[in-house]
């Protein structure tokens, strides 16, 4: 189920994005980018509709995915 990012409290959204970018395996290329820049990039993708927040009822987990993949 897609959860609109606008329905999530700002602090919760920030924490969700932070957890997402800190996951092992999240690759931003050869150039090191600051944590805040990574968070800002993901938030921009959510705002533009390029990424979505997905809740899995089966696993009771939340994830951020590219809209094209979902």
From Swiss-Prot:
The lineage of its organism: Bacteria, Pseudomonadati, Pseudomonadota, Gammaproteobacteria, Vibrionales. Belongs to the UPF0270 family. This is UPF0270 protein VP2791. It comes from Vibrio parahaemolyticus serotype O3:K6 (strain RIMD 2210633). InterPro entries: UPF0270, YehU-like_sf. Pfam families: UPF0270 (PF06794). It comes from the Bacteria. Gene3D superfamilies: YehU-like. Transmembrane segments: none annotated. HAMAP family: UPF0270.
């Amino acid at each position: 189920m897609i959860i609109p990012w606008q329905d999530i409290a700002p602090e919760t959204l920030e924490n969700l994005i932070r957890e997402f970018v800190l996951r092992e395996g999240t690759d931003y290329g050869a150039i090191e980018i600051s944590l805040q820049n990574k968070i800002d990039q993901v938030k921009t993708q959510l705002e533009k509709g390029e990424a979505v927040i997905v809740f899995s009822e089966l696993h009771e987990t939340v994830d951020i995915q590219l809209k094209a993949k979902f």
